[in-house]
Amino acid sequence: VTAEAREAGLSQDPAADGERPLDIALLTYKGNPFCGGQGVYVRHLSRELARLGHRVEVIGSQPYPVLDEGAEYAGRLTLTELPSLDLYRQPDPFRTPGRGEYRDWVDALEVATMWTGGFPEPLTFSLRARRHLRARRGHFDVVHDNQTLGYGLLGDVGAPLVTTIHHPITVDRQLELDAAESRRRRLSVRRWYAFTRMQKRVARRLPSVLTVSGTSRAEIVDHLGVQQDRIHVVHIGADTDLFSPDPAVRQIPGRIVTTSSADVPLKGLVFLVEALAKVRAEHPDAHLVVVGKRPEEGPVAQAMERYGLEGAVEFVKGISDAELVDLVRSAQVACVPSLYEGFSLPAAEAMATGTPLVATTGGAIPEVAGRDGETCLAVPPGEPGALAAALSRLLGDAELRDRLGAAGRDRVLRNFTWAKAAEGTVSRYREAIADSAGDGPRRSPAGTPRSAPLPPGPSAQGAPGAQGAQGAPARGTGTPPGPEAAQADGPAGVTRTVRDSEAVHMTEAAS
């Protein structure tokens, strides 16, 4: 682009929709795909937005997002690290930072909230993000928040705000409370999920909300009180190039595969373990492979011991994308036993590989998996007997497996791809920008490239980096109680831009 074109606010090439490319700030307080579905969302959506010709800057905290590389969008996808104190990193979660690690009052707030049993990251990330965005006013056409829902994002963040809410975390909170067996545990759950009060207040003031399913839309209205006309459904999906059938991968007789991002009631893993015990009476070779971390205690560990299934249940974590896909391909059946999901990426990804699916009807899972007997076998949530019957039926019927597997992949290709998700998201970006046009100019002239990044601020003395890994690539979208940490470093070729500038006054975050 020539200097004259820059001055005129012109862009060299239009985006895929024929309009001017957008400069997008995509915020995520926990963006690593090894941590949960929010990281998967950021990884794939950012890539597809860049493929459409837009410039995407992902702004995230530890464990840092993993972004994809691609020659066709080189230079249009960057990562900005906005470091926290990384209090939940492995192998020392709930750690107390050293004196030299504290940089400002937000750090002190983060530690104080953890010490009192709360989960600070949505609030503290939002405060740091607000400070960062205000320092870079005029750089972005739109700010897209990936379910931070923190006080720091209320008011003017320098560009129109669009927010994704995958599902209300209040659903997770209620399921945790229902499963709590003691008063002490219930008190702990309430304290951990105290941030949901903030999220309710923030959600009600948001101008534009994206969500991933009609079920989530209804839950957001009911649980968070958001006006329905502010909520837009944009389905997400599977990477159908990666998750695809491969006849060269041998299916293992009796293999059932599932994904469990955390040992929490919402995922329903304990019911699948109980179902496996019943299935093995009819199919002795039936065994379960769980993509996730093995629980050392709790209901799942107790069920495995009670039914003598230690040798029939395997947990795998930290595997690559290719290894994950081959694992799903090798299974005769994939299973989603969740009590509730706002979408269910595991269902879409399993179906995309052509692996037949048994899934519950919890939450939005039927929107993804389709009708019972047509694209999956569907069972009520929380019923191990029904799960066992469906699993046994599929394990014993090769023709049914083939039919459901083919129909499932066709359903995903028609409805649930990341390319479609990106196109729908851009449409909502442009609507938000148009709706805010009456508020006065928010950025530099259209098409003007972003100015050079701010110089990096001084690194915090002894500031920790994200370490360790908790689980394999996980596909849930909630924030389960307890520490989550994952490998922080993405591909070496991904550009890392400016860290939070210390030149920005701390008081801006609270103003």
Description of each model-found segment:
Residues 2, 14-21, 59-127:
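A conserved catalytic-core segment of Leloir-type glycosyltransferases
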